[in-house]
Amino acid sequence: MTRGSAAWPPLPPRLKPIVEAEYPRYSAAEMASRRAAVEAALAAADCDHLVFYGANRAGSAVQWLTQWPVTVEAIGVFTLRERDALFVQWINHAPLAKRLAAEADVAWGGESSIGAVIAALEKRGARENRVGVVGAMNFAQHAALAARFGNIVDLNRAYVRLRRVKSQEEIDWLRIGAWLSDRGMAGLRDGLAVGLNERALGDLIERAYLREGGTNVIHFIGATPMHDPQLGVPAQFPSTRRVANGDLVFAEISAAFWDHSGQVLRSFAVGEEPPPLYRALHAAADAAFDAVAAVLNPGATPAQVVEASGVIEDAGFTIIDDLLHGYGGGYFPPDRKSVV
């Protein structure tokens, strides 16, 4: 492993004001554009109201519409020409939610957030079969909505379609997430040493971006002898195995900036140069990256991507992880009509 004097990744100066803001915010124009898109989706589905849901730090629609990142639970009500109603758990989360979701009417969800949502819909005159939902609500919550408002329209696929093409502002925030992820990898590169266990490697990674406002999404780490490899992918949970000379240490890192994350994967040879197998693997990986990147143009199909990846099999290898996926919205279900 040669450290040299490799520089840490720079942040483009135009993005510094976003990172340094007390609480970064999307512009009013960006938020208005999102609302217009949701209004059009509701009209297409013959719905008047949208219930959007998130829990356990998942549920991107909540933040996308209100700028409140989900913590324990958050359920919102979107209605044309009205302020959103947003009900959060727990009560001690409500003060900050009110500050960040300043354009919504925010309240604690009380003993039942879905009960509060139903009351809000009733107050807004919601009719049967005219309420849509985005987010992974549980069975009891869906049943409660359906008992009061009839057939509930699943708008999750419509929401995914809205999110597939990112705005320029979203791309900027994702660039920050990528910068933070790169910092994590740089921290691993510069701190990696014989004798550290995988838990300590995770500390190197997180320490590199936490101070800049990043949060951990994943840092999968693998360490294995290059002459007797036992791992094909970085492990999802760190072990207490200690790094030794002759190891390959490889990592998959995603750090996020307000739920906008990047992803980076790198490998480091410890104490000696990589043997022929690892050189061949990395040569095949580089060739596959270049071949796939060359076909990623508007209108490209998944079949073209798979065809381009044939250089992997041509080199005598295969893959045991995703060949290609998008970022900034999650993994999407297969769609026969999908184009890049």
Where are these regions (language model features)?
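Active-site neighborhoods and metal-handling regions in enzymes and metal-associated proteins
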Residues: 1-340
